[in-house]
Amino acid sequence: MSDTTPADQPRQMTPGEAADFAEQVFNKAREGDAAMLAALLSKGLPANLRNHKGDTLLMLASYHGHVDAVKVLLEHKADPEVRNDNGQSPIAGAAFKGNLEMVKTLVENGADIEGASFDGRTALMMAAMFNRTEIIEYLIGKGADPKAKDANGITALDAARTMGAAETVAQLEKLLG
């Protein structure tokens, strides 16, 4: 038996090369390169690949607002419920950023409306904190509970008040009567 690699076998990446390649893949998600992600996924790249912070490709693409890349990842069975190491979900990131189209895309593909981070914060709470009135309307229309409390007993309305988010305070006060 020979110690050499046959010519038809690909060369194995070194650990450093693999780490560099992985970082390039995560950058493609951040940049929203849907075509490259589709090509890599079709070659066997795991759809739920995570970086050193626990962020998935889906988390990065959704946070940075790349709906086409998110759709490609979801088509390849990326899980919209995978949280990063801080307990943050893609839907909470999209709500924080104020991206209604992204929130809708994630919900339509299985994201839990009431899914909470480790501290109990939901996407509705994130939207309330940052005056994301359209997202609040959408999430409540889909069944989000405006009376839900985080681990500290804080509701979406409480969070909006704390952050000085006047529009969402008025919206939630009207809704809650």
Q: How would you label these PLM feature ranges?
A:
Residues M36, D68-A69, E101-M102, E134-I135, ...:
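Conserved ankyrin/ankyrin-like repeat signature
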Residues M1-N27, N109, G141-K142, A151-I154, ...:
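Ankyrin-repeat-protein effector appendages
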